Amino acid sequence: SDHRRQRQMCIRDSISTVTGLGWRKAGDPVYLLGVPTADGESSTLGLAGSAYQQLAIGRLAGRPPETDFNLEARVGGLVRDAIARGLLASAHDCSDGGLSVALAESSMASDYGISADLAAGGVRMDRLLFGEGGCRVVVSVKSECVQAWAALVDAVEELPITPIGVVIDQPSLIIKVDQTPCLDLTLQQCRDAHAMALPRRIEADAEVAK
């Protein structure tokens, strides 16, 4: 059977309902949907097969995270509903690089930064920052829509929704872990590192091929 993923085209009635990955306004609260940051046990989240593992050890190994199709559907349903109601300023999945990379990418795609404080709950730092899977989506909610967002969330049963930070009016990626400083980078530093990702990968592959 053919297990290849099929790309789907989504047709919108109005461009006003299109939600990008970049932050839109300082002061907008940021939430993590899906497996919470402090969950160190979920088999749907891990480092096996991740971008971090490839960079750290130069290869992919181990059993990749499992897929919770029920949670995926519920997270996706909430995101679509919130977008349709005009509540979200941005939405970005954490499937490639993990939570910290998603926060960096949403910042680089805008003129704003993020100040985040992640609850670790004993979770290993690499899993916390770079774990992939977990049906995770990072969203920023329009500050004027916080009450409507809260009402929508209250109607959703047993869906993990974790407040993790706020959009800031400065070009910085600021991440604390349990209120302790962890990362403090300018967006230019993030962009420089991002621009070098492909050359580094090509160089690494060339070394392996020798």
Per-segment meaning from a language model:
Residues 1-7, 11:
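Single conserved hydrophobic/aromatic residue that forms the stacking wall/gate
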Residues 5, 61-64, 71-76, 83-210:
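Glycine-/charge-enriched secondary-structure boundary and capping motifs
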Residues 8, 32-34, 140:
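Short beta-strand segments
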Residues 12-13, 35-37, 142-144:
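Short loop segments at secondary-structure junctions
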Residues 14, 37-53:
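Short, Lys/Arg- and Gly-enriched loop/turn segments at beta-strand edges
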Residues 14-19, 48, 125-126, 160:
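Glycine-rich, flexible loop/turn motifs
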Residues 14-35:
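Acidic/histidine-enriched ion/cofactor-binding microenvironments in catalytic or ligand-binding pockets
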Residues 48-66:
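Gly-rich Lys/Arg/Thr-decorated short loops/hinges at beta-loop-alpha junctions or inter-strand turns
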